């Protein structure tokens, strides 16, 4: 069936003894041996035994080339789409000069040899949303963000910046704290440019807060729905841990600022909760 398809197919294997990378296409794989080459290409040594073909032992092609963009270019591709699953092996620089998109996940996809069906289904859903995001069909960084409703994200971003500025006026170190939270959790800066998902920076604090309280990631959200789900996921108001920094009451500014510095993501989660509490209730209808 693969040989009869109009879609070209290729794979990479690695000679075990020499660690030489071998690029293979259907044209140079002998008839009847495709399954052998596929098994060799996926023999992830040392977890899986090397696979022998014609007296030569081979291991997973990813050891020397885990994203074979060059092979796709040689086979006639005019545009490349690579998938980075953060696996073992060597990722070679892309020297093809072709338009290229790399799809990768914000989330930990689990151990390499975890074959749990529930996790697999979740990872498939995450991969779909990562792809949709890369092609500009969804926004966000970690979550799949659907088109906005009633300018909720714009209003959230404006209120968040206002509350952040107010907190910084009480403790100037919070400017760095907020930036570190984004950096630690791999979220973009507030006004970073991104052509495929231009709203990523604005909604990043809400996504970060949602991640911190384990909002499910395998379904898409509108900004409003993500906010509502975040609030529903909180047993207690995260903002209660920083009442002084957030201007809710008088207290120990230095102590709360030190706590925020120690756990930047926790402070941003509190700030998001505080921000949402300041938004008009009509925005959540």
Predicted features, each with a name:
Residues 1-285:
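Patatin-like phospholipase
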